[in-house]
A protein has these predicted regions:
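Membrane-interface "cap" regions at the ends of multi-pass membrane proteins
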Residues: 1-54, 59-64, 77, 81, ...
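Membrane-interface loop-to-helix entry segments
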Residues: 147-204, 259-263, 382-395, 421-425, ...
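Extracellular loop-to-transmembrane helix junctions
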Residues: 49-145, 151, 262-272, 445-455
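C-terminal membrane-solvent junction of multi-pass transporters and transport-like membrane proteins
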Residues: 173-176, 346-358, 393-442, 470-473
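A generic transmembrane alpha-helix motif of multi-pass inner-membrane proteins
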Residues: 383-389, 418-487
Length: 487
C-alpha cells in the first residue's frame, strides 16, 4: 500500500491516530456520541429546512414533489454514507479540506475547504435572513432591507457569542435544541395523523401524489429536477460533525455513526412530514400564495396555536443549524491556518482558554454579516450555498473513490459496502446537481460560483505556505496543550 493505506483507524486511540496522521492534539476532546449526532442533526434541521423551503418543490411539480424528495433524498443518503467513511478514515478537524488534501493534493484540498467554508457561511447568513421576518411577524413588525440586515446581523452575533464562549456551551445549546425539536415535532406529527384520520377535513388519496395540480405545463422532466433540489437544500452539510472530530471521543467510530444516524433520521422524518403536508393540503395555488405555506396547511388541521408551535420549532431548528454551521466553518479555517495556509495563520490558529478558535469564529461572523447584504437575492444565496456544497463534496467523493481504488486510504472503522458502485453513482449525482443549479440561474449562480473560485485562487496565492506540507508542530494558541478530556 502507498500513501496512508497502511494506517488503520480501528486499532489506534484518538490522539495516537491523530499523530500518525501528522498532527499534534491541540483541541479539547469532550464530545460524546449524542453531541456528535446533535451537531449533524442540528446542521440539517429537517423541520426548519422543510418549513422554509417547502415551496421549492411545490411550485415545481405540486403534490408530485413527494417523489423527487424520496429519490433525490435517497441519493443524498448515499453521499452521506460515503462522506461518513471518509471522516472515519480521517477523523481530523477541517473535514473535507484535510481529506482531499491528503488524497488529491494541497491545492485541490485547500480549494475544496474554501468552497465548503463559503457554503457554511452563506448558509449561516441565509438561515438568519429567513428567521427574521418570521420572528418579527409574531409581533406584527416588518422591516425594510437595512432593518432586515441589522436583525440578521443580531442573530449572527448571538450565534457567535454562543460559539466563542466555549465548546461546552455551544454543544449543550445544540443538544437541548435538538432534543426539544425531536420530541415536539414527533408530537405534532402524531397530531397531524390523528387529525387527518379522525377529523372532518377531507384527506387526499394516494393518487394525489401522482398529480401536479396544474403546476406543470408541458414536459415534466425539468420541473422534477427542480423539485429534486428540495432534499439537496435540506439534506446537506455532510461533514459538519467530522469538522469536530478532534473534539470528539472515539472519533473514528462516533463521528460516522452520528453522521449516518442523523442523515437517515432527517430523511425519514422529512419524508413523513412532507407526505402529511401534501395529504393535508388544500389547493396548491392558495398554499403558494400564502406567506408561510406550511403554517397555512397546518392551521385548519391542527388549529392556529399548534400550527404556530410547529413554526416556532422550525425557527428553533434553523437557529440551531446556524450555530452549528458557524462552529464547523470556524474549524475549517482553523485547520487551514494550522497548516499555515491562510493569511494571518497565527491569528486563525490561536485558541482561547476554552480551546475555541475565537478569531476564526469572529471572521465567519463578519463574512456572514456581509453576505446578508445580499438579502434581496435570498433564493440566489441558497442556490450558491447548495452549489458550493455539491461541488466540494463532489470533489471529496471523487478523490476518496480514486484513493480506495489505489489503496491509499486508511482502513476506516466505518466502511461502505458496495463502494465500487455507490461512489461513482454519488459522483454522477453531484455533477447532475451542479448542472441543474447553474442551468436554473446561469447568470447569478454561475457567475457567483466563478467569483467564489477566483476568490479562492487569490486567497490561496497569498497564503504563506501554499506549497508546504502539513504543519505538525504544536499549536499557536493562547494556552497551548494537548487534547484531553477536560470535563
Amino acid at each position: 500500500m502507498s500513501g496512508d493505506g497502511a494506517l488503520d483507524a480501528r486499532q489506534t486511540a484518538d490522539d495516537a491516530y491523530l499523530e500518525e496522521l501528522g498532527y499534534k492534539p491541540q483541541l479539547s476532546r469532550k464530545l460524546g456520541q449524542f453531541s456528535a449526532f446533535a451537531l449533524q442533526f442540528g446542521t440539517i434541521a429537517p423541520i426548519g429546512g422543510i418549513v422554509f423551503t417547502f415551496a421549492v418543490g411545490l411550485v415545481a411539480v405540486g403534490p408530485a414533489m413527494f417523489w423527487p424528495w424520496v429519490i433525490a433524498g435517497g441519493l443524498q443518503m448515499l453521499i452521506a454514507l460515503c462522506v461518513a467513511e471518509a471522516c472515519s478514515a480521517y477523523p481530523i478537524a477541517g473535514g473535507a479540506y484535510n481529506i482531499v488534501s491528503r488524497l488529491g493534493g494541497s491545492f485541490l484540498g485547500w480549494q475544496t475547504g474554501w468552497w465548503i467554508e463559503l457554503a457554511h457561511i452563506f448558509s449561516l447568513a441565509s438561515s438568519c435572513i429567513a428567521l427574521v421576518p418570521v420572528i418579527l411577524g409574531w409581533f406584527g413588525v416588518s422591516l425594510g432591507h437595512w432593518g432586515l440586515v441589522g436583525a440578521a446581523a443580531a442573530l449572527i452575533l448571538i450565534s457567535t457569542l454562543i460559539n466563542v464562549t466555549s465548546v461546552k456551551l455551544s454543544t449543550r445549546f445544540v443538544n437541548a435544541g435538538v432534543v426539544a425539536t425531536l420530541i415536539a415535532c414527533a408530537l405534532v406529527s402524531v397530531g397531524v395523523v390523528a387529525a387527518l384520520l379522525f377529523g372532518n377535513d377531507p384527506v387526499h388519496g394516494a393518487d394525489y401524489l401522482f398529480t401536479s395540480d396544474g403546476t406543470v405545463k408541458g414536459s415534466v422532466i425539468l420541473p422534477l429536477l427542480y423539485a429534486a433540489l428540495l432534499p439537496c437544500i435540506v439534506l446537506n452539510g455532510f461533514d459538519v460533525s467530522g469538522n469536530a472530530s478532534e473534539e470528539t471521543k472515539d472519533a473514528a467510530r462516533a463521528v460516522p455513526k452520528a453522521m449516518v444516524r442523523a442523515n437517515l433520521g432527517s430523511y425519514g422524518f422529512g419524508t413523513v412530514v412532507i407526505l402529511l403536508l401534501i395529504l393535508a393540503m388544500g389547493r396548491v395555488s392558495d398554499t403558494l400564495a400564502s406567506v408561510q405555506p406550511v403554517t397555512f396547511i397546518l392551521s385548519p388541521v391542527l388549529g392556529h396555536d399548534l400550527a404556530k408551535l410547529f413554526e416556532g420549532l422550525a425557527v428553533l431548528g434553523l437557529f440551531v443549524s446556524a450555530v452549528v454551521l458557524q462552529l464547523a466553518g470556524a474549524r475549517v479555517l482553523w485547520a487551514q491556518a494550522r497548516d499555515n495556509k491562510l493569511p494571518l495563520s497565527s491569528r486563525f490558529s490561536a485558541l482561547n482558554k476554552e480551546y475555541v478558535p475565537s478569531f476564526a469564529v469572529w471572521i465567519t461572523a463578519g463574512v456572514a454579516v456581509l453576505s446578508t447584504l445580499w438579502s434581496s437575492l435570498y433564493v440566489v444565496l441558497i442556490a450558491m450555498t447548495v452549489v458550493l456544497w455539491v461541488t466540494g463534496y463532489g470533489v471529496l467523493l471523487t478523490t476518496m473513490w480514486l484513493g480506495k481504488l489505489r489503496g491509499t486510504v486508511p482502513t476506516a472503522a466505518y466502511r461502505v459496502r458496495g463502494w465500487r458502485v455507490i461512489f461513482p453513482l454519488t459522483i454522477v449525482w453531484s455533477l447532475t446537481l451542479c448542472v441543474v443549479l447553474i442551468y436554473q440561474n446561469p447568470r447569478q449562480v454561475g457567475l457567483g460560483l466563478l467569483i467564489a473560485f477566483v476568490a479562492g485562487l487569490v486567497v490561496y496565492a497569498v497564503s504563506p505556505a501554499r506549497n508546504s506540507g502539513r504543519n505538525t508542530v504544536g499549536p499557536v494558541s493562547a494556552e497551548a496543550g494537548p487534547s484531553a478530556d477536560r470535563s
